[in-house]
Amino acid sequence: MMSPTPEDDRDLVVVRGRLRMMDNGAEHDRERRSYTAWPHLCCGCTIGIILTMFVIATTLLLASLFAFSYMSLESGTCPKEWIGLGYSCMRVAGNNATELEALDMCAQHNSKLVDFTNAKTLVEAIVPFGSTNASFGNIFRLRDSRSTCILPTIGGPISVDCPRTCSVVCQRPRPLSTAASIIRDARIYLRLERRDYYEVYSSILSNAIMK
């Protein structure tokens, strides 16, 4: 067998160098792919975290809308010139008013005429501050009846026939806090609750407490 000539050695070196260059290029490609994969991985993780937080927030919001009772978030403070009684606020709106005038007076204050239970409790509360006469107060109308009114006396409230004009006592629910108002408005917007639900519910709770 003939020994390799110098020309053959040069060819072999070139081939070996070319192979080494090819190996180095493959390693460089792998490193470049690994470097570009990290940003995509981080971006995917960030999007996944954001979506998870969005799902959790949506779940909590829906749970609060469907299951949370916002009655526990009421402020408990009646507006100025209103008297707090149970879950309701009351105010004397005027005197010598007809039925239509009484309804209009309460509507101007975003309220309604006082109901019988609150009227009875209010009269019993002011009796100790009345005079010794059999009758010391003005007759005022009730929400529950168009023909029967309440007359405060030292012995307590009594029912009388409504005259043409009476005093006007208005009633409205205690105000809600900001968070409770947002929940209530959302329920009303989604038609999960009637607009007058809070007023009716607060009146029921107030009457239950006073009985």
From Swiss-Prot:
Virion surface side: 68-211
Keywords: Glycoprotein, Membrane, Signal-anchor, Transmembrane, Transmembrane helix, Viral envelope protein, Virion
Membrane topology: Single-pass type II membrane protein
Major localization class: virion
Source domain of life: Viruses
InterPro entries: CTDL_fold
Topology feature Intravirion, residues: 1-46
Keyword Transmembrane helix tagged: yes
Family affiliation: Belongs to the herpesviridae HHV-1 UL45 family.
Protein name: Envelope protein UL45 homolog
Organism ancestry: Viruses, Duplodnaviria, Heunggongvirae, Peploviricota, Herviviricetes
